[in-house]
């Protein structure tokens, strides 16, 4: 088996459709062995079958229905992946939902909390579960999915935006905690994708998501959006040895020259590609300092 991920084992959450499935396909092509999970067991089984049909001899692809917001499910997935694949080197936290669409005072609070549980808490739980073996092996790759909600406000999609921003800051914090054990933790902004989440926005209509956001979503649907392959390719890079030592960053699959990052090693030891507070002097204003 050849490929930049040959011999490595990866757990990918939310891998039964959309970007998660595209990442699984890219990892398969790069030589990885895969353990996939998602809440919809039927779609997951179909995804596993499609991947197995493309697998090289001796490549392993397994799947298991699980809800990453449930600690027992997370423990089971990591235990079964480790039993089946041996040491796991890669975790991709892709599972996520938009949550309720609408003004914060109008939505169902339980739906808002559910989005936080899946998007943020699920990611944290998965990290907690794999970190002991990553630390024991003094190596690991964690890839988070941030989405546009991490870097820009998303009115009427507040649960998604809040959870994705939290994911990025959690990833940056965990990157510092795990740096000495050679565990890299990074986040991907995949760009505007034409996936299930976009269809949910269009189905909700402008009354719930706002006229401006709905208009942009409809245009994106018509024009095709960003290719999922770019996000998947970045996920391969961040799981490979080529990115060793690059950690605590949020990278745009579409706009950032991530393929060239290894040649900018010294510059990466700064706050580039991170979330930071903007102060007046950053915008050239002559006020704001005491």
Please state what every model-predicted region is.
Residues 105-124, 139, 143, 167:
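Catalytic Tyr-X3-Lys loop
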Residues 127, 163:
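Active-site helix of classical SDR
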Residues 30-47:
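Conserved glycine-rich Rossmann-like NAD(P)H-binding loop of the short-chain dehydrogenase/reductase
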Residues 41-42, 65-77, 109:
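The beta1-alpha1 cofactor-binding region of Rossmann-like NAD(H)/NADP(H)-dependent oxidoreductases
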Residues 75, 98-113, 136, 156-159:
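Conserved mid-core segment of classical short-chain dehydrogenase/reductases
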Residues 187, 207-290:
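C-terminal helical subdomain
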Residues 9, 16-17:
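Conserved glycine-rich cofactor-binding loop
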Residues 30, 152, 173-183, 242-244:
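Active-site-adjacent segment of SDR/Rossmann-fold oxidoreductases
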């Amino acid at each position: 088996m050849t490929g930049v991920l040959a011999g490595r084992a990866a757990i990918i959450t939310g891998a039964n459709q959309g970007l998660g499935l595209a990442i699984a396909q890219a990892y398969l092509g790069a030589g990885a062995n895969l353990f996939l999970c998602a809440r919809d067991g039927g779609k997951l089984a179909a995804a596993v079958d499609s991947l197995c049909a493309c697998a090289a001899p001796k490549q392993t692809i397994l799947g298991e229905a699980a809800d990453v917001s449930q600690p027992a499910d997370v423990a089971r997935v990591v235990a079964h992946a480790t039993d089946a694949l041996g040491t796991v080197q890669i975790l991709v936290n892709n599972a996520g939902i938009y949550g309720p669409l609408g003004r914060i005072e109008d939505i169902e609070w339980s739906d808002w909390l559910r989005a936080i549980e899946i998007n943020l808490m699920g990611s944290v739980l998965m990290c907690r579960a794999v970190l002991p073996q990553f630390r024991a092996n003094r190596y690991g790759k964690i890839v988070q999915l941030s989405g546009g909600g991490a870097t820009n406000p998303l009115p009427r999609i507040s649960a998604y935006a809040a959870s994705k921003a939290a994911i990025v800051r959690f990833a940056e914090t965990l990157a510092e905690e795990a740096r000495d054990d050679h565990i890299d933790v990074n986040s991907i902004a995949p760009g505007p994708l034409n996936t299930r989440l976009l269809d949910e926005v269009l189905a909700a209509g402008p009354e719930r998501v706002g006229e401006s956001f709905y208009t942009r979503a409809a245009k994106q649907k018509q024009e095709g959006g960003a290719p999922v392959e770019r996000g998947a390719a970045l996920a391969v890079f961040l799981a490979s040895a080529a990115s060793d030592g690059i950690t605590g960053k949020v990278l745009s699959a579409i706009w950032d020259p991530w393929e060239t990052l290894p040649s900018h090693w010294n510059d990466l030891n700064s706050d580039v590609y991170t979330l930071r507070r903007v102060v007046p002097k950053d915008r050239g204003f002559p006020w704001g300092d005491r």
